[in-house]
Amino acid sequence: VPTAFDNSYARLPGHFYSRVDPTPVASPSLLRFNHALAEEIGVTAGDFPTDVLAGNALPEGAEPIALAYAGHQFGGWVPQLGDGRAVLLGEVVGPDGRRHDIQLKGSGPTIFSRRGDGRAALGPAIREYVVSEAMAALGIPTTRALAVVTTGEKVVRERPLPGAVFTRVASSHIRVGTFQYHHARGDLDALRALTDHVITRHYPEAAAKEVPALALLGLAATRQAELVAQWMLVGFIHGVMNTDNCSIAGETIDYGPCAFVDNFHPGKVFSSIDLHGRYAWGKQPEIAHWNLLQLAQCLLPLHPGSTEDARGEFEAVLNEFPDTFARAYEQGLGRKLGLLDPRPGDLDLARDLLTLLAEQEVDFTLFFRRLTAQVESQDETQSGVHDLFGCAKGFDQWSAKWQERTSQQDSGDQARTMRAANPIFIPRNHRLEEAITAAEQQNYGPFEKLLEVLARPFEEQPGNAGYENPPESGEVVHATFCGT
C-alpha cells in the first residue's frame, strides 16, 4: 500500500504557500536512502523511488508547495523569503501518530527563488545528511535526512559543482519567520489560523489555556531554551540563527554553515558570513531569546485583553527564558563533569573549567572524553587528559577541586553519567570536508564511513579511533559556507 499523505498545511489558506511542482533533473541516481528513518515514520523505499526523490515524479497524494515566510537575517528585516529551492511534497503520519513533513531541497525554482536557480550542490546535501543524522544520534531534536540523490547536472556557484536533491523530514517546516510573514502584512486571520495549526500540531496542551497564544509562546520558548543548551553542551555552533531558521517545533533546522568547536573558545565563529560574531557559540542563548521576542510580537495581537495587559503577560513569559536555559545548561554541564547531585558552587567549578579550556585552546570534545576515561580508569596519567594542556598547572588546580567535589560519589555511577553526556564521536569539520571533497570526485566511501561512525557517538569503536581526533594543523577548518 503506498504511503498515505495527509497534507494539513496545504489545507491552510492559499497565501500561506505557492503550489509548485519540482523541476525534473537529467539523470538522477540514488546515493543514500535512510531505511531506519523510513521505518520510524512509516514509509518504505518503495514509496519513494529515485524518480520521486529527484523531483522527476510525484508520489500519489502529494500536494507540492513552497512555503511563504519572512525573517530577520543577521538582525536585518526581510519581509519575504520563503522556500526558494525547496518543495514540501506533503505530510505522512507515522505509526506513533506523529506527523512528518517530507520536503525536497534543491528541487528547482519557486516564486520565492529571487535570483537563485533553486538547485543544491552535493556538498551541502552531504553536510546536512551527516550532521542532522549525527545530531539525532546525539539525542538532540533535529530535522532528519531521508535520502540524497545526485542529479547528473552541475550547479554553478564559485565553480561548477555536482548537483543533488536532498530529502528532509521534519515535524514541520513552520518557523518564527512564518509568523512574521503574516504579522508584517497585518493579517490577523492568517495569524489565528497559523497559531491554531501550530497548537494542534505541536503544542496541544496550549489549547485549553486561557490565552492559547501566550501558552504557545511559553512552550516554544522552553523547547528553544533546552535545544540551545543541548547544542552548546556538544560544542555545536548553528552559524545562522536567523528567525527563518528557528523552527517553531524546537528542532534544529538548516545546517548551512554549522560547525562543531575544536579548540574551545566561547566567541568561536565558523560561518564565513558571520563577520561580527553575532551567532558565536556563547551568543546562541541570547539570539534564541531575541528570536522569541520576535515571535511574541507576532502573537501579541491574539491576546484578548488590553494591549498593556497583553504586553505585560508576554514579557513575563519571555523573562523566564534565561532561567529555563540556565537550568538546562547547568544540569548538562553537571552531567558532563559527573556531578551526580547538584550543589552550590557547581556552576563556578564548570565556569572555571571553560575559562581554562578557552585560555589554552583545548579541544572541547576530546577533553570531556578523556576526563570520562580518567574516571573509568581512576588514572590521570593513563587518560591523557594532561597532554591536552600546554601548561597543566591550572588544570591540576582545577582537577584537585573537582576530585574533592566528586570524592563521595560512586565512581561507577559517575562514569556512566559522564559516558552518556560526553560523546566520543562528533561530525568534526575536517572529516566533513574530507567526505564532501571525495564525494565531489564520486568517491562516496568517506561519506558512508562517517555515517557509520557517527551513528554510535557514545560507544568505543576501536577500529575507528582516528575519527575521535581533532584536525592536524593542515586540516583545520576555519570557515564554513552556506552553500546556497
Cite the ranges covered by each PLM segment.
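Short, functional N-terminal and low-complexity linear motifs
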Residues: 1-8, 19-21, 97-102, 161-166, ...
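Regulatory N- and C-terminal appendages and interdomain linkers associated
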Residues: 1-69, 275-484
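Short, mixed-charge, low-aromatic patches
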Residues: 8-12, 86-90, 150-155, 246-255, ...
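Active-site-adjacent bridging/hinge elements
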Residues: 9-13, 100-110, 195, 199, ...
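Short, contiguous strand/loop micro-motifs
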Residues: 21-23, 117-119, 214-215
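Conserved ATP-binding subdomain of kinase catalytic cores across diverse folds
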Residues: 27-30, 35-209, 248-251, 291-292, ...
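ATP-dependent phospho-/nucleotidyl transfer catalytic cores
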Residues: 125, 154-238, 249-355
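Hydrophobic HxD+1 residue recognition
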Residues: 240-241, 246
